[in-house]
Amino acid sequence: MSDNIFFSKEFKENLHKYEEARKNGSSIFLEPGQFTDIAEYYHLHGDLKTALKVIDDALNIFPGATEPLAFKARVSILVYHDVDKAMGCVAMIADKQDLEYFYITAEIMIVDNRVKDAEKYL
């Protein structure tokens, strides 16, 4: 993802809406990718706890959504070094034909030192 998205008007509006909803204790409806963009923003700014809260909010609305589950899987492998948890996230992805599903699965294989398996998989 390009950092430029964080400077877009749409992103700033979505971030503001999300933060206002959290402050007021209300819910907000965004698309899975929009929630994930907000989570990436928080993670980039060193706030992993809030990033994961955003992802949980997304998954409460869209339980099988690719983008939030892929984000959660990446955090599992890159931050927590937990391949099993990452694979659990990937297993919950509803659209097994989404390219991101294939990419995150291969990334997990690579982190798990199964590079040849990842090459065959892709």
Residue positions per predicted region:
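Structural register within alpha-helical repeat arrays
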Residues: D37-I38, K72-R74, T105
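Residue at a conserved register position within TPR or TPR-like alpha-solenoid repeats
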Residues: Y41-Y42, S76-I77, M109
